[in-house]
């Protein structure tokens, strides 16, 4: 006798998240926005490439703004009211992504820059000659 097949619904929409952490990783080529709960479980994510920007358009500030808005739109449906923001990377989309997060209506407890800074670690890549 086979077991009855259980129907697995979408658990993503069931969860209510009052507080979360928004991680913005802004590299020179792309901007990735990940939203987690306070334990670190990923709730939603978006990137400039996933929003439809390809090639050099991914590194623009407008692409970062679109990625931040897409990531936050899903968590607003899940009831997130407060958030912390962790920004890392030197990319051109970091300020625009933060501006889009501020405009979204989520109360921000703090904004922290977590860009890794070497204490004279690895040698940096050579300068480009264009």
Curated annotation (Swiss-Prot):
It comes from the Eukaryota. It holds the Pfam family Ribosomal_S11. It is found in: Plastid, Chloroplast. Keywords: Chloroplast, Plastid, Ribonucleoprotein, Ribosomal protein, RNA-binding, rRNA-binding. GO terms for molecular function: rRNA binding; structural constituent of ribosome. The keyword Ribosomal protein applies. SUPFAM superfamilies: Translational machinery components. The keyword Phosphoprotein does not apply. Transmembrane segments: none annotated. One of its GO terms (cellular component) is ribonucleoprotein complex. Its main location: plastid. GO terms for biological process: translation. InterPro entries: Ribosomal_uS11 (IPR001971), Ribosomal_uS11_bac-type (IPR019981), Ribosomal_uS11_CS (IPR018102), Ribosomal_uS11_sf (IPR036967). Belongs to the universal ribosomal protein uS11 family. HAMAP family: Ribosomal_uS11. Part of the 30S ribosomal subunit. This is Small ribosomal subunit protein uS11c. It comes from Cycas taitungensis (Prince sago). The gene is rps11.
């Amino acid at each position: 006798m086979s077991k009855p097949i259980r129907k697995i619904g979408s658990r993503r929409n069931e969860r209510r998240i009052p507080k979360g952490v928004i991680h913005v990783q802004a590299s020179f080529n792309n901007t990735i926005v990940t939203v987690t709960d306070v334990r670190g479980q990923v709730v939603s994510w978006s990137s400039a490439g996933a929003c439809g920007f390809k090639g050099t358009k991914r590194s623009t500030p407008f692409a970062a703004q679109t990625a931040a808005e897409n990531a936050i739109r899903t968590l607003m449906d899940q009831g997130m009211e407060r958030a912390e923001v962790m920004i890392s990377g030197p990319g051109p989309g970091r300020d625009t992504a933060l501006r889009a997060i501020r405009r979204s209506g989520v109360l921000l407890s703090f904004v922290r820059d977590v860009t890794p800074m070497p204490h004279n670690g690895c040698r940096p890549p050579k300068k480009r000659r264009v």
